[in-house]
């Protein structure tokens, strides 16, 4: 199914980008891409977003395995008839597995995309995080649009 190819693409790009960061940048170093907006910063995270639940790897292992199983089940059941849902779930699946690979093999997640939004220093993130967020946003948009159609 094409949605698994999307997940594999996300995993590949995520893992290659993280490998490049680990091999070519010292932890904590930063390269400006757009001054005061976008940087490539070598960072590690032993928890979830904003460092929540730091060093609770077994929790993340269990949650991720259950979550991935749910996503695969949901994809098999609903993605055949709903392309946008399939794409969204493919992005979410790829993102979840990308960060899971880091947690299993590194005991931490490699983050490197560092954004400043106006004066807010947004937490450093990675390709897997981006795919997860985009997938969730697409599902929310689809849900809102379907809700609007139902009301009409």
From Swiss-Prot:
It is found in: Cell membrane. Coiled coil: none annotated. GO terms for cellular component: plasma membrane. Keywords: Aspartyl protease, Cell membrane, Hydrolase, Membrane, Protease, Transmembrane, Transmembrane helix. This is Lipoprotein signal peptidase. It holds the Pfam family Peptidase_A8. It comes from Bacillus cereus (strain AH187). The active site is at residues 111, 129.
């Amino acid at each position: 199914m094409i949605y698994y190819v999307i997940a594999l693409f996300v995993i590949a790009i995520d893992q290659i980008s993280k490998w490049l960061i680990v091999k070519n940048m010292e932890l904590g170093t930063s390269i400006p891409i757009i001054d005061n907006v976008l940087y490539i910063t070598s960072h590690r995270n032993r928890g979830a977003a904003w460092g929540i639940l730091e060093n609770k790897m077994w929790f993340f292992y269990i949650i991720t395995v259950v979550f991935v199983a749910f996503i695969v089940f949901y994809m098999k059941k609903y993605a055949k008839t709903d392309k946008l849902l399939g794409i969204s779930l493919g992005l979410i699946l790829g993102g979840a597995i990308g960060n899971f690979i880091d947690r299993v093999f590194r005991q931490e997640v490699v983050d490197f995309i560092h954004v400043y939004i106006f004066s807010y220093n947004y937490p450093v993130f990675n390709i897997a995080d981006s795919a997860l967020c985009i997938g969730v946003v697409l599902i929310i948009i689809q849900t809102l649009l379907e809700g609007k159609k139902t009301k009409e």
